Amino acid sequence: MKMKWLISVIILFVFIFPQNLVFAGEDKNEGVKVVRDNFGVPHLYAKNKKDLYEAYGYVMAKDRLFQLEMFRRGNEGTVSEIFGEDYLSKDEQSRRDGYSNKEIKKMIDGLDRQPRELIAKFAEGISRYVNEALKDPDDKLSKEFHEYQFLPQKWTSTDVVRVYMVSMTYLWIITRELKNAEILAKLEHEYGTEVSRKMFDDLVWKNDPSAPTSIVSEGKPKRESSSQSLQKLSSAVIKASEKVGKERENFVQSSEELGLPLKIGSNAAIVGSEKSATGNALLFSGPQVGFVAPGFLYEVGLHAPGFDMEGSGFIGYPFIMFGANNHFALSATAGYGNVTDIFEEKLNTKNSSQYLYKGKWRDMEKRKESFTVKGDNGEKKTVEKIYYRTVHGPVISRDETNKVAYSKYVSFRGTEAQSMSAYMKANWAKNLKEFENAASEYTMSLNWYYADKKGDIAYYHVGRYPVRNNKIDERIPTPGTGEYEWKGFIPFKENPHVINPKNGYVVNWNNKPSKEWVNGEYSYYWGEDNRVQQYINGMEARGKVTLEDINEINYTASFAQLRANLFKPLLIDVLDKNKSTNGNYTYLIEKLEEWNNLKEDENKDGYYDAGIAAFFDEWWNNLHDKLFMDELGDFYGITKEITDHRYGASLAYKNISKESTNYKWVNVDQEKIIMESTNEVLAKLQSEKGLKAEKWRMPIKTMTFGEKSLIGIPHGYGSMTPIIEMNRGSENHYIEMTPKGPSGFNITPPGQIGFVKKDGTISDHYDDQLVMFAEWKFKPYLFNKKDIYKAATNVSALNMSK
């Protein structure tokens, strides 16, 4: 792949062509200057931060007001008021697990003055545009408001925090402990206690010392897999898990229809001066939050005396998550640390609104919520629901028959506004110490990355992690009777972190941060077979690296058949041992060794280039079924998401490579299974398609940005063009921190401006980065004023005194 010339050509094109344009929209009045570059990205120049953040809210609302409204309503639990009863279940869960306006205001009031004031100014900026739009709805309200017949509301700081919660908080409000308990209970019923616990420990291990980590350390921790301390749970856990699981499926479906981000992953890399070819620190960002139109990321430049920053953040956030200021570049990925526990509450047989806690019956907190729901005939009705809360948190399931309830305990509950404030402080930091101080105040589970002008890099696994009672197993729910409460939180300095690591770089794809760190119910995310190995392999195969090298590594990771990393060498080895018995095996070895493990379509004919990729895909599926389907039987369906997870298939690898496991999953020779799968798949492909791999080529999988509108209704706004499927960030930033400041290239598809006129007309910048994204082209990362004005197509001013 010829990456370097693609990058050079597009950057050259961008800098040359706009320079002689006349700024028809230029306004000489004083105020905040809004400089729109040739991709529609606003670069804001203000005389103070208050004006800057108000302008920030204003331009975001101008570009994406309908999207902001959906996010706000998504957390507020008022979607069904606009779109009807199909969304009531989602609203109910949002209210059940969420906060009242009063509770959010209390959080905001506890913030330091500057972030508190600037969040308010950001909200004022959104309201400023709302006021303008309400006065001129035909021109300034996007088509969706007219189509669905409702008006936007003015915003407050509370709404800004709600938008933050709807995306960031959702990731950690998880209930996997119930699913694990369901699996364990069903296995116990089928296989008995002793055997089932061995199986469970293999499926949901506590700690895999072979798992790749972002912090490279010497030595290996002891493998933890014993479940001798498993707490006894009620038989009601199966019913509760199935109920909560169904509710979550409905929540996910309706949220995706509304365009709310639920798939939060991400990859990132930082390179220090010793590993960098230029001696400058490098940073790569690849937040994975889905592909929709308009996108979830909003790009902006923020400039005020003493503060300059350029980059992207999630829509509605008053800060930048992926970008750089004058002093350093920053990025983030989801940390997947264990910040949520489910507690099993014992209910009073005489009063199911009471639960046993520390030897006494306590009344649950009780509150009534009213929902305004739009009916099919357009008329609105009121629906009332009662919600309960224990000392541990919101009650997510109650079983009146078995007198058991389950509540959700979240370590960062009540601190969400503090985390927003911490991110704003990270934006304003001028050095590593100030960045680290901001990181120490962040309470949700993320990985933070830092690369500065001095060549220094740093990585922090941020978050507020509980110190749990060592008598319980954190993979399943905890008894809520008071004996097994959290004992506090791990000090920030003990969270995994590293500054200027010896290997010269840090990479992450939501993998394990360090050898000793575990993540409870989601431990199967962090195993020996993990997708981050794509970035590790890429870095280790190179000496000193450039941004172009990192881009090539990212390209490889985006198209890789992830199972090929560990399983292809095993397959080739077994084929080599048996090649004398069948001439086809030598041919397969040749094709597998030629294959670069990528599912790409460089000749753009609509088929993956390598026919052997079709063989490997089918071989893997066949092999996986042979390893687990017969052994698990009816349980195969509920465990496949573990054994064939998108992050890796570690248990399958341990089985097929003859590593030690607690339970004997394979009762025949592993090589025999590999050969059986090979012979079956080979016979099928040769019979159906032909003898040679060139005939096996399969059609590419495609994806679109916004095939449906934000509420699931097809639209024709120019983003239905299919492109090849990529396991890639929703945007990419590549930044080099030179002595003069940040430089580099980026792409934020499908485009900057999501506004659709009443007549359906879209902006030129609605999807102008879509084809570039598909072709791995980039635009220049604009930071200094001279370059920004060279690329400008419109300069206007906002008078903040009006």
From Swiss-Prot:
Concerning Pfam families, the annotation shows: Penicil_amidase (PF01804)
Q: What is its EC number?
A: 3.5.1.11
Cite the propeptide residues by number: 235-265
Alphabetically ordered keywords of this record: Antibiotic resistance, Calcium, Hydrolase, Metal-binding, Secreted, Signal, Zymogen
Q: Where would you say this protein principally sits, based on its record?
A: secreted
- Annotated signal sequence is 1-26
Binding-site positions, Ca(2+): 177, 341
Q: Which GO terms describe its molecular function?
A: metal ion binding; penicillin amidase activity
Q: Which cofactor does this sequence's record say it needs?
A: Ca(2+)
Protein location:
Secreted
Q: What class of enzyme is it?
A: hydrolase
How the cofactor binds, per note? Answer: Binds 1 Ca(2+) ion per subunit.
Catalytic function, reaction form: a penicillin + H2O = 6-aminopenicillanate + a carboxylate
Q: Which family does it belong to?
A: Belongs to the peptidase S45 family.
Please give the subunit comment from the record.
Heterodimer of an alpha subunit and a beta subunit processed from the same precursor.
Q: What protein name applies here? A: Penicillin G acylase
What is the protein's species of origin? Answer: Rhizobium viscosum (Arthrobacter viscosus)
Query: Source organism lineage?
Result: Bacteria, Pseudomonadati, Pseudomonadota, Alphaproteobacteria, Hyphomicrobiales
The gene coding this protein? pac
